[in-house]
Amino acid sequence: RTLLCTSDTDRSAFGTGHFRIIDTDRLPGKAQSEQQSHSSDEERNAYIIFTSGSTGEPKGVPITRANLNAFYRAYSSLDWNLDEHDRMLQMFELTFDVSVVSLLYPLTLGAAVYTVGHQDVKHFKVFELLEKYQLTFATVTPSLLQLLSPYFDEINLPSLKYLGVSAEASQTELLERFRKSVPNATFINLY
């Protein structure tokens, strides 16, 4: 296990487990990077996402640190009541922008992230994870809900606090039918 932290991190919060601690303030090249202006740092790429967009032609789109920060701030401004005790689902391909927030946001809270392996049948594995680990937060697509709609009567997820619906337009009727399966969840349209 490796723990990345800065010099001002209170390390007592991590217990006495066996961690390899890396102080990012002491990494080689740190002094040089601190000489760069804040604005130029924000303009640096955080990652590149590949999308076909409306053209159907795959292209790489650079996402700057400022873009990522804005996306993260917008996501966290939704006033979730989430913390390190929550268990969150990340089911999206890493080429989809929601995957970045679905992975990074929970980790910044200290929450657990559960992912669907590429070898699994995604739509069934999602609900297996939600049920088995009593996940508290999930973002899914309306297509996934539509595919599983014949099984709504068998799905009971009382631990789910938030259900984000993303990637495409949602049908109100479909969401209302699914509401019985997630009686304690607040629905959030993230499309």
Where are these regions (language model features)?
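Structural core segment of the AMP-binding/adenylate-forming
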Residues: 1-27
